[in-house]
Regions:
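Serine-esterase "nucleophile elbow" of acetyl-processing enzymes
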Residues: 1-13, 18-32, 163
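Substrate-gating cap/lid alpha-helix
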Residues: 82-118
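Glycine-rich anion/phosphate-binding loops
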Residues: 15-21, 49-57
Length: 168
């Protein structure tokens, strides 16, 4: 376990942001969480889904959270390693993936969020290979980085007033 508080990981490998929206009611609501850590969009953006579509999905998840008294906490989207994705899955990565991720992360940074990405990219903005053998799903070293970022920010998240989640 990488976090200093109890969590349930609802991630599904291969999920798009649209799929995350579709399974919200079934997967999230039974747990009645106070907070929801949200890291979605990598698979969508890798495939070239427009940033605006992923942002719309993030907004929908935020609305669903707030309507059920759940505080959404967005996590910034890590970089990708297209060569490793190609080798692991024989799948291409959209040529403009970096600008797509940058656009979605710019939106995320306007919300209650935790930046989990510092130190993940090499000098070219590519996900460091030791963090994810397949180029997209973080292995234990990458998960430890995410855990440390969340743990370091969590006290500040808990201290936020309710109004922090109402602003768009």
């Amino acid at each position: 376990n990488y976090l200093m508080f109890p969590t349930v990981n609802l991630a599904q490998s291969g999920d798009t942001s649209e799929m995350a929206v579709e399974r919200f009611d079934k997967d999230v609501l039974p747990f009645q969480p106070s907070y929801l850590l949200i890291l979605i969009g990598s698979n969508s953006l890798r495939a070239g889904v427009p940033a605006e579509d992923v942002i719309a999905d993030l907004k929908t998840i935020k609305e669903k959270c707030l309507s059920h008294h759940i505080r959404p906490v967005f996590l910034t989207i890590p970089p990708l390693n297209p060569a490793h994705i190609k080798r692991a899955f024989d799948e291409p990565t959209a040529e403009n993936w970096q600008s797509l991720i940058a656009a979605v992360n710019a939106y995320i940074r306007t919300q209650v969020h935790i930046d989990i990405t510092p130190g993940m990219a090499d000098s070219h903005g590519i996900l460091r290979p030791e963090l994810a053998v397949d180029g997209i799903h973080l292995d234990p070293p990458g998960k430890k980085m995410i855990g440390a970022a969340i743990n370091n920010a969590w006290k500040g998240i808990l201290a936020l007033p309710d109004t922090a989640w109402q602003e768009d």
